[in-house]
Swiss-Prot record:
This is L-lactate 2-monooxygenase. It is an enzyme of class 1 (oxidoreductase). Catalyzes the oxidative decarboxylation of (S)-lactate (L-lactate) to acetate and carbon dioxide. Its physiological role remains unknown. Keywords: Flavoprotein, FMN, Monooxygenase, Oxidoreductase. A 2-oxocarboxylate binds at Y45, Y153, R188, R294. FMN binds at P98, I99, G100, S129, Q151, T179, K267, D321, S322, G323, I324, R325, R345. The lineage of its organism: Bacteria, Bacillati, Actinomycetota, Actinomycetes, Mycobacteriales. SUPFAM superfamilies: FMN-linked oxidoreductases. The active site is at H291 (proton acceptor). Pfam families: FMN_dh. This enzyme proceeds along a 'coupled pathway', wherein rather than releasing the alpha-keto-acid as a product (in this case pyruvate), it remains in the active site, and after reaction with hydrogen peroxide undergoes an oxidative decarboxylation to produce acetate, carbon dioxide, and water. Its EC number is 1.13.12.4. It comes from Mycolicibacterium smegmatis.
Length: 394
């Protein structure tokens, strides 16, 4: 049996034959190097948060308020980090969270395909965004046998929503993640300062311009055939923007649940009452997240919301993201009750540094650190990693 921590031995072994790492090993260095590699507009979009970015910073700081209590003499030579979710075996309790501009983070402009390829090689599941350069069908092919999930920005037009859902089903996605907190754009000073919003420029809209329902409605609206969508991305962007502004309701979730057998996961849940109602409505998963502090400033760190959301969700799996920067953060979120933990900015920086290989390196580095922490601290599997393993440091 191999452990994720073996990546450490691989790196040291290469050093013995004179091969030094070409990619940095820590979040701070990933970010610093990526800042030199990315265009200003992409960098501001990925790095920025809402308002004065207090919530974004608080997401990260929250992890420092908890420490893992070590247990000795536990025979943790081998660790099992696999997890069963929605009928699929995940090789690790970590996933690539959806990022709308991940395509633009890679030097070749195809970071979404690169993410799926890294997913296939590592076994770390990928949640692909509706906003992508590659089509959702192509991205699913790149992910291979690794579980993959489609994230939906729910449009106000149900015909279009159903079209996306049917396409995801036919492409072989293993579940549907509905984002709840991005029906309107948060106040993001970094982007506003340079008047930059990539999607209004027609970027990352491939899933829309290739969709038959979108094409039909666009033609009825403008008289332009589908070919015109590809030739004039600004026209497509204007029409796309008009589809936003619909705040997702419980009735919408009931409707989605009625038309698909795919597992349905709700992203953006932070209040325990919302988690309870979601479970009662029949959804298959809860995704505790505050969008990395990108949508609403002045809120709680997502980690502070996690324990109550987990408790309210009962046996329903709970995914988590927001503020993950290290393998230690991954371990702490799992101990707080997350079924699996999503990374966002770390793999965006990886895409900037080395495309698919950079993303793979980031994932393997985080999982190696998490695995080695569990080894040193005496936790052999995820069942042993509970909230009782944590102590407050403040």
């Amino acid at each position: 049996m191999s452990n994720w921590g073996d990546y450490e031995n691989e790196i040291y072994g290469q050093g013995l034959v004179g091969v030094a790492p070409t990619l940095p090993m820590s979040y701070a260095d990933w970010e610093a190097h990526a800042q030199q590699a990315l265009p200003p507009g992409v960098l501001s979009y990925v790095a920025g948060g809402s308002g004065d970015e207090h919530t974004q910073r608080a997401n990260v700081e929250a992890f420092k308020h908890w420490g893992l209590m070590p247990r000795m003499l536990m025979a943790a030579t081998e660790r099992d980090l696999s997890v069963e979710l929605w009928g699929k075996t995940w090789a690790a309790p970590m996933f690539f969270a959806p990022i709308g501009v991940i395509a633009l983070c890679a030097q070749d402009g195809h970071g979404d395909a690169a993410s799926a390829q890294a997913s296939a090689r590592t076994g770390v599941p990928y949640i692909t965004s509706t906003l992508a350069v590659s089509s959702l069908e192509d991205i699913r092919k790149h992910a291979g046998d690794t579980p993959a999930y489609f994230q939906l920005y729910y449009p106000e037009d149900r015909d279009l929503a159903e079209s996306f859902i049917r396409r995801a089903e036919e492409a072989g996605y293993d579940g549907l993640v509905i984002t709840l907190d991005t029906w309107i754009f948060g106040w993001r000073p970094r982007d506003l300062t340079i008047s930059n919003f990539p999607f209004l420029r027609g970027l990352c809209l491939t899933n829309y311009v290739t969709d038959p329902v979108f094409q039909k409605k666009f033609k009825a609206h403008s008289g332009v055939e589908a070919e015109g969508l590809r030739d004039n991305p600004r026209l497509a962007a204007d029409f796309w923007h008009g589809l936003f502004g619909h705040s997702v309701t419980w009735e919408d979730i009931d409707w989605v649940r009625s038309i698909t057998k795919m597992p349905v996961i709700l992203k953006g849940i932070q209040h325990p009452d919302d988690a309870r109602r979601a479970v009662d409505s029949g959804v298959d998963g809860i995704y505790c997240s505050n969008h990395g502090g990108r949508q609403a400033n002045g809120g709680l760190p997502a980690l502070d919301c996690l324990p109550e959301v987990v408790k309210a969700s009962g046996d329903t799996p709970v995914l988590f993201d927001s503020g993950i920067r290290t393998g230690a953060d991954v371990v702490k979120a799992l101990a707080m009750g997350a079924s699996a933990v999503g990374i966002g900015r770390p793999y965006a920086w990886g895409a900037a540094l080395g495309g698919s290989k950079g993303i793979e390196h980031v994932a393997r580095s985080l999982l190696a650190e998490a695995d080695l922490i569990m080894a040193v601290d005496g936790y052999r599997n995820l069942k042993e990693l509970t909230i009782d393993a944590l102590r407050p440091t403040r």
